[in-house]
Amino acid sequence: MSKLNPYFGEYGGMYVPQILMPALKQLETAFIEAQEDESFQQEFTELLKNYAGRPTALTLTRNLSPNPLTKIYLKREDLLHGGAHKTNQVLGQALLAKRMGKKEIIAETGAGQHGVATALACALLGLKCKVYMGAKDVERQSPNVFRMKLMGAEVIPVTSGSATLKDACNEAMRDWSGSYDKAHYLLGTAAGPHPFPTIVREFQRMIGEETKSQILEREGRLPDAVIACVGGGSNAIGMFADFIDEEEVALIGVEPAGKGIDTPMHGAPLKHGKTGIFFGMKAPLMQDSEGQIEESYSVSAGLDFPSVGPQHAHLAATGRATYESATDDEALEAFQLLARSEGIIPALESAHALAYAVKLAKEATKETILVVNLSGRGDKDIFTVADILEQQKVEQQEAEQQQTNNQNN
């Protein structure tokens, strides 16, 4: 049985304590066997169709495009059960865990979407569920915390470091190193030690496969570009995987530029990172001059990650994919724009991809087809956005008042 390549070019690998090597090797073997097992594939496909609601729609937007030459399609992962693309690969990994005889699932979550997806899969498949979540994220994503608990998950707030996603990842990995005989670590993104980046890509691959057949049916040709937001990179690699060999299709990932790419407040390791070892892999990483991990920042909890999946690093290095960025303000604008123009409220993560797509659409000089992976819905973000908009309103009023005072003096 052939083993999988742990590297994508120079990126990837298995940089973990020796104690975890048997667990990762066992996982790799189980995954290879499952990929070749017709009954496993059948059960996975059946769950995706009849439980999760696949295939998801490919929606041509009516009013979003600012340019009559550009059509913008949305791949509607927001319509999936659980509210985001996360459900796809979580069902795959949970089935894999059962196949390996594991009784317990350990997971980490940022925005809470991966935690919710893990909780629903565990409830469905009768597995015990433990979710590590940065204390800061527990606070800003309370609806998802309640959803997880409602479905029987134990949510553990992590207070170390910046109390966000990277710290939750570290705690989850630490827990797993002491319990892998009975527990499976259900990693939520296409990053981490081998074989996780490959497993997650293969369990998200249907996003791009469906998109390809749907767009060919609708337009009779492939799109000019597929666009997806990138934190760790699972929704993007799921969209890109089936298009990598289609050279005429541009692959565009959009990282969070936060308060601005030139400030310390962003989460764009592909643009501004240096290669380092983090979370069991070799990948671009936000580091300071002493090599310490810098805190990443994004208005969207799910993109708040200081590194990126190794295959994205390789696609960037070879030039097959390009990686742009969108600021908090651009994402907030796109969030509102989609709601107003199409009646669809996107996740703040997905809004980063939308922001760049609208920018790209404006520049088109010939007929252009863009597909945006709408990776999740925005219910979880409405209170965050409401608070920010209220704050902006107050600041604007104060600035106007100040201006009036200055004119009167």
Curated annotation (Swiss-Prot):
Name the domain of life this protein comes from: Bacteria
Reaction(s) this enzyme catalyzes, per UniProt: (1S,2R)-1-C-(indol-3-yl)glycerol 3-phosphate + L-serine = D-glyceraldehyde 3-phosphate + L-tryptophan + H2O
Q: Which residues form a coiled coil?
A: none
What cofactor does this chain's UniProt record say it requires? pyridoxal 5'-phosphate
Q: Record keywords: Lyase included?
A: yes
Q: Which residues cross the membrane?
A: none
Q: Which pathway is this protein engaged in? A: Amino-acid biosynthesis; L-tryptophan biosynthesis; L-tryptophan from chorismate: step 5/5
One GO cellular component, as annotated: cytoplasm
**Sequence positions bearing N6-(pyridoxal phosphate)lysine:** K86
Tell me the GO molecular function terms: tryptophan synthase activity
What keywords sit in the KW lines?
A: Amino-acid biosynthesis, Aromatic amino acid biosynthesis, Lyase, Pyridoxal phosphate, Tryptophan biosynthesis
- Which E.C. number(s) belong to this protein? 4.2.1.20
**Secreted among the record's keywords?**
no
Q: What HAMAP family would the database entry show?
A: Trp_synth_beta (MF_00133)
What does the record give as the function of this protein?
The beta subunit is responsible for the synthesis of L-tryptophan from indole and L-serine.
According to the record's subunit comment, the protein's assembly and interactions are: Tetramer of two alpha and two beta chains.
UniProt similarity note: Belongs to the TrpB family.
Q: What is this protein called?
A: Tryptophan synthase beta chain
What species is given as this protein's source? Shewanella pealeana (strain ATCC 700345 / ANG-SQ1)
What is the gene called?
trpB
